[in-house]
């Protein structure tokens, strides 16, 4: 088995864990009320990211996110060859699809009850309220509902910009935490701080876009929802909304990494102040 195959396998496993914990927490909150408040969901997401990174970082670098992979390929090509972009992306999407399928299998009766109680017809307008446990929608249907009044609050351009902003912050932090010349980097605590950053970003921006920051996390479960009867509500989504969760993170992640290089990395000492460690993405 080649090193690339092992790395891709780790990306499948890591992305599966991340998406399972994250979308599972959303499903539990929306369908059963198990989590009370956005911060509880955000914390589960954050710990899911942390666990997934600890499990896979030594094998693949734990990108677990196409936006992180693209940023590394463009800005750190010596450590991450660009030929690995598509294999990593494919692995991440596969892991996310598998996680979405597990969430559907586990929560299927609760989804049916949720839709029946609220008169939701799966695949029709308004079924974003149940589809949101898989893909993401703007604004957050659990907070603002669905329909024209809700849609007037957040347009596709704003949603794309918010997704770009959140992913830019995330990759900026990741680059800072793993930079060998950063004498203050937390070493083995790096995955925790990446997960904590994700939790903070979710708590801030989830009311607006559900806070994706990860094209695989959004698209993989969307595929499951599409096949499970949500159809156009899943892909392309109302107002073609799924594109916001692909374009925004891919652009924002690279811009965030570039901003780190221009503002902080360029000011760091030339010598590596600490022993090198495995690069960890998020």
Predicted regions and their residues:
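Membrane-interface helix-loop junctions and terminal tails of multi-pass membrane proteins
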Residues: 1-282
């Amino acid at each position: 088995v080649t090193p690339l195959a092992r790395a891709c396998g780790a990306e499948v496993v890591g992305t599966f864990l991340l998406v399972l914990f994250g979308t599972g927490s959303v499903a539990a909150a929306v369908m059963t009320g198990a989590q009370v408040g956005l911060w509880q969901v955000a914390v589960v997401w954050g710990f899911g990211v942390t666990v997934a990174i600890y499990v896979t970082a030594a094998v693949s670098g734990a990108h677990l996110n196409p936006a992180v992979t693209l940023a590394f390929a463009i800005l750190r090509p010596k450590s991450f060859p660009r030929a690995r972009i598509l294999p990593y992306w494919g692995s991440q999407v596969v892991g996310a699809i598998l996680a979405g399928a597990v969430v559907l299998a586990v929560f299927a009766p609760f989804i049916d009850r949720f839709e029946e109680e609220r008169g939701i017809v799966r695949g029709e307008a308004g079924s974003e309220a149940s589809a949101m446990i898989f893909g993401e929608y703007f604004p957050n249907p659990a907070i603002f509902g669905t329909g024209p009044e809700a849609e007037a609050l957040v347009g596709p351009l704003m949603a794309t910009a918010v997704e770009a902003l959140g992913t830019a912050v995330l990759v900026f932090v990741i680059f800072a935490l793993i930079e060998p010349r950063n004498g203050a980097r937390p070493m083995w605590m790096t995955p925790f701080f990446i997960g904590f950053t994700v939790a903070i970003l979710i708590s801030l921006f989830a009311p607006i876009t559900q806070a994706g920051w990860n094209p695989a996390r959004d698209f993989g479960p969307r595929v499951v929802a599409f096949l499970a009867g949500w159809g156009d509500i899943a892909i392309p989504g109302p107002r073609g909304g799924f594109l916001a969760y692909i374009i925004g993170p891919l652009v924002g992640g690279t811009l965030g990494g570039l901003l780190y290089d221009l503002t902080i990395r360029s000011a760091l000492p030339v010598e590596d102040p600490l022993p090198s460690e495995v690069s960890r993405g998020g």
